[in-house]
């Protein structure tokens, strides 16, 4: 037998740690004669207990399974908490690397109250801190900076995200760099969608190359740029050409400066703070500050001497009243809003905003404008009133739309024109027109268009229980009561006969004494034909009725076929001015010479003539 197993590797799990190959040696003796001997011997053998016929025993397999499951569970927990574990093999490679930690190492609480005077512990802490700082600096110096700048920016963002309050950290960095608080220069916008032209922006850890490039790239977006770089903070004052929201400003700067949103703070500047304006004005003279463009108006207002003198102008109520009168503003909300918008260009409006009695001024202004308008209306004839209202109508229309609609309702236009002439001149017992008929015939559309162009008033009978529901009749040249029902006809028949006769009536006014007036021309629409009602026989001579029997027509696009617009009525009055017996405005205007508009302000001594 020979040993040929040298250098052969075997599986250690195959029972034995060693393996032997036994090779039998051949014998010349034949076994043919010994076969009988072999059979006679049978199952006899010299080896005892070669085969184990006893029952098998399970052994300790359950313990083995528990050990395997425990090892697997510990491995999973280790993977989940791997950032809290350190590999001993890696730490043993370098003691210096082992001393560096990202998270702060807090002292054990049991040593907080260790008995000591404090001097020795202070020295120990100082030595430990110095040693740790030196080791970190040495490792940083020995290491090479990453080539990828994106990785550096990502590291800055991660450092910011580790802070519990990123905004507070940026505000502290800003005050440390510029010596003034960021919120002292700005006012706060709660919503990121509110638009403003001027924005104060500060950024953290921006590359110098990108800051230099932004000076040119922002020129196309801004009328004024103010820039100062005090590492690691950078401060911008950007006056955009158009209003932008905070979201839009963030997207623009993130694209130009390659920064994350967490690195940016943006708020609009304080426009009325003199200290804030001086910060930007004096800062622009600093050689380290880049400024491009003309100063914004709000900086000029706070810093220049001529603007300061204009700021001292006292508020003049008559100027505000003149503005509201010229622009036909009667309601208090319209006066307040539109006059406040003039603060950028008008010194008196700016003084109005700085006054503490704005609400009182608005009420008094609206009251005075109503007084002037009422006096002007009473001084005008119906011809002058119609001419004045037609002057403000822009665009061109055609008078034939009115004529065609009247004829479409089977009304003789010559008769309608004659009645309409008496109606406009407020002739007694002819100053009330009724348009009746079934629904959807255009009654309200026709009368509302006339009321709109002549700036008339609409009365609602729903308020008839109030003593003042007829008060608008004192402030108009023409009025309308739409959709008159039986109840309203009964009220007119009982209480308004004298008014329809053209006589003076006593009208109750709110917060004022009752006044004596004549009713202006009155338009009525109804679904009832009172001419066939015997109970209203006393109104037959006071009301002129026209029937609208046909439904108002619409084309295939659901648009009206008759254009009852302001332009159509303007063309109608211009075309039929003489037929309506309206006076010539050149005669009333002193042979066509221009008349000076109403002036409710005192002329300045050195003013223009």
From Swiss-Prot:
GO molecular function: ATP binding; ATP hydrolysis activity; DNA binding; DNA helicase activity
Similarity comment: family membership: Belongs to the papillomaviridae E1 protein family.
Residues in coiled coil: none
Location of the motif Nuclear export signal: 93-102
Subunit structure: Can form hexamers. Interacts with E2 protein; this interaction increases E1 DNA binding specificity. Interacts with host DNA polymerase subunit POLA2. Interacts with host single stranded DNA-binding protein RPA1. Interacts with host TOP1; this interaction stimulates the enzymatic activity of TOP1.
Pfam families: PPV_E1_C, PPV_E1_DBD, PPV_E1_N
Modified residues (Phosphoserine): 87, 94
Annotated protein name in UniProt: Replication protein E1
């Amino acid at each position: 037998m020979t040993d040929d197993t040298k250098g052969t590797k075997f599986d250690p799990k195959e029972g034995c740690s060693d393996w032997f190959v036994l090779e039998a040696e051949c014998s010349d003796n034949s076994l043919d004669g010994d076969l009988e001997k072999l059979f006679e011997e049978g199952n006899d053998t010299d080896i005892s207990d070669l085969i184990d016929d006893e029952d098998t025993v399970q052994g300790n397999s359950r313990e083995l399974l528990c050990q395997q499951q425990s090892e697997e569970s510990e491995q999973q927990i280790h993977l989940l908490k791997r950032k809290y574990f350190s590999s001993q093999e890696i730490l043993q490679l370098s003691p210096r690397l082992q001393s560096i930690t990202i998270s702060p190492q807090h002292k054990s609480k049991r040593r907080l109250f260790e008995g000591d005077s404090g001097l020795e512990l202070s020295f120990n802490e100082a030595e430990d801190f110095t040693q740790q700082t030196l080791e970190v600096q040495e490792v940083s110096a020995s290491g090479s900076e990453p080539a990828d700048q994106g990785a550096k920016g990502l590291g800055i963002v991660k450092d910011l995200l580790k802070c519990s309050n990123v905004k507070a950290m940026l505000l502290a960095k800003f005050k440390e760099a510029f010596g003034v608080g960021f919120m002292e220069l700005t006012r706060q916008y709660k919503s990121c969608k509110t638009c403003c032209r001027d924005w104060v922006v500060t950024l953290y850890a921006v590359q110098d190359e990108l800051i230099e490039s932004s000076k040119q790239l922002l020129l196309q977006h801004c009328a004024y740029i103010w820039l100062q770089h005090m590492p690691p903070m950078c401060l911008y004052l950007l006056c955009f050409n158009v209003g932008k929201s905070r979201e839009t400003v963030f997207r623009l700067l993130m694209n130009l400066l390659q920064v994350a949103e967490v690195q940016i703070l943006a708020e609009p500047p304080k426009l009325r703070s003199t200290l804030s304006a001086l910060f930007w004005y004096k800062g622009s003279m600093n050689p380290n500050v880049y400024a491009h463009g003309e100063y914004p108006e709000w900086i000029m207002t706070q810093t220049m001497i001529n603007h300061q003198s204009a700021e001292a102008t006292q508020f003049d109520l008559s100027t505000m009243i003149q503005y509201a009168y010229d622009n036909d503003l009667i309601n208090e909300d319209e006066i307040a809003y539109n006059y406040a918008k003039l603060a950028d260009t008008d010194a008196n409006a700016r003084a109005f905003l700085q006054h503490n009695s704005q609400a009182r001024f608005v009420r008094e202004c609206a009251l005075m404008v109503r007084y002037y308008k009422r006096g002007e209306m009473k001084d005008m004839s119906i011809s002058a009133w119609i001419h004045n209202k037609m002057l403000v109508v822009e665009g061109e229309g055609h008078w034939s739309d009115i004529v065609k609609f009247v004829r479409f309702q089977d009304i003789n236009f010559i008769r309608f024109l004659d009645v309409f002439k008496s109606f406009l001149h407020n002739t007694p017992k002819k100053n009330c027109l009724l348009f009746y008929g079934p629904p959807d015939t255009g009654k309200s559309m026709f009368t509302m268009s006339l009321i709109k162009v002549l700036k008339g008033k609409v009365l609602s009978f729903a308020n008839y229980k109030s003593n003042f529901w007829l008060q608008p009749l004192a402030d108009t040249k023409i009025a309308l009561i739409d959709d008159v029902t039986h109840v309203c006809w009964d009220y007119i028949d009982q209480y308004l006969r004298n008014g329809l006769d053209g006589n003076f009536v006593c009208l109750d006014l709110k917060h004022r004494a009752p006044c004596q007036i004549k009713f202006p021309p009155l338009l009525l629409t109804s679904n009832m034909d009172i001419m066939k009602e015997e109970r209203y026989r006393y109104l037959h001579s006071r009301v002129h009725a026209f029937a609208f029997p046909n439904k108002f027509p619409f084309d295939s696009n659901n648009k009206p076929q008759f254009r009852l617009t302001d332009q159509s009525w303007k063309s109608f009055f211009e075309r039929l001015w003489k037929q309506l017996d309206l006076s010539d405005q050149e005669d009333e205007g002193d042979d066509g010479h221009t008349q000076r508009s109403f002036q409710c302000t005192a002329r300045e001594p050195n003013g223009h003539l």
